Amino acid sequence: MNLIICCTPLQVLIAEKIIAKFPHMPFYGVMLSTVSNKKFDFYAKRLAQQCQGFFSMVQHKDRFNLLKEILYLKRTFSGKHFDQVFVANINDLQIQFLLSAIDFNLLNTFDDGTINIVPNSLFYQDDPATLQRKLINVLLGNKYSIQSLRALSHTHYTIYKGFKNIIERVEPIELVAADNSEKVTSAVINVLLGQPVFAEDERNIALAERVIKQFNIHYYLPHPREKYRLAQVNYIDTELIFEDYILQQCQTHKYCVYTYFSSAIINIMNKSDNIEVVALKIDTENPAYDACYDLFDELGVNVIDIRE
């Protein structure tokens, strides 16, 4: 049996493609997420339907629950053996402990998003070398780090064909198929993709409200991890993540999709004549986020600078 570990709805979409490559091998699915909402629950169920066995857990960031959940994962998975393991978030401490608790023959990785192809992202760095982290690793038995898992990965499955990834051995997969519907001539619907860029909700709300007004946004699709609510825009209420939703809707409507630096627009670029994408350049206060705009330029994305 193979093991596949997901942390986001996008990873579930990728996982479905990977599972399809092994039609005669059963999979055990794991869904670890930092939030619980209908979107995450919907994709967790989709993953479970593809797997012979399934485990899910909502993760917490506070120290007490983090340690409690590490012990729970170790107890749940200790001694289990898998042929191949597939994982995206090699930086996640709880995933590192889960991997330390099991035996496996082969480790493979897959994309978490543009973080995989943006230089100097956290996947190209190592874990924090703090005394606290070292003590946790030693006392609770973590055998792995970001870089040791990169080195161990046999194959990396990527939705970004032609780009350098965290390891050299890559196998491209097509996340979504092109839509061959006829070009729609109706009025364009402007959609803003939600993205919690800043730690403070107030800053995210202020930025979104400015963009909504400036670009005449008709609809807002919140990020799966968003917990705040905007007042002056119509929400798209769907269990589907952006890629699934927009490729259904573009068959009968024409869209212009605005984002800050979401990898989602890369996933649907050139998939339909009824979808246009625009990236809005902002002050992110994060070099890894800023590097996304260089990537967008390379891909030919229309980038509009709205920095104040």
Swiss-Prot record:
An example Pfam family from this entry, by short name, is Glyco_transf_52
Entry EC no(s):
2.4.99.-
Which keywords label this protein? Glycosyltransferase, Transferase
- Binding-site residues, CMP-N-acetyl-beta-neuraminate: 221-225, 242-243, 262-263
Q: Does the keyword Transmembrane apply?
A: no
Q: What is the relationship between pH and activity here? A: Optimum pH is 6.0. Active in a broad pH range of 4.5-10.0. Low activity is found at pH 10.0 and no significant activity is found at pH 4.0.
What Gene3D superfamilies has UniProt attached to this entry? 3.30.370.20
What broad class of enzyme is this?
Answer: transferase
* Cofactor, how bound (note): Divalent metal cations are not required for the alpha-2,3-sialyltransferase activity.
Residues annotated as catalytic: 201, 223
Q: What does this protein do?
A: Catalyzes the transfer of sialic acid from the substrate CMP-N-acetylneuraminate to lactosyl lipids as preferred acceptor substrates in vitro, forming alpha-2,3-linked sialosides. Beta-1,4-linked galactosyl lipids are better substrates than beta-1,3-linked galactosyl lipids. The natural acceptor substrate may be cell surface oligosaccharides in lipooligosaccharide (LOS), whose sialylation has been demonstrated vital for the virulence of P.multocida.
User: What is the protein name given in its UniProt record?
Assistant: CMP-N-acetylneuraminate:beta-galactoside alpha-2,3-sialyltransferase
State the species of origin. Answer: Pasteurella multocida (strain Pm70)
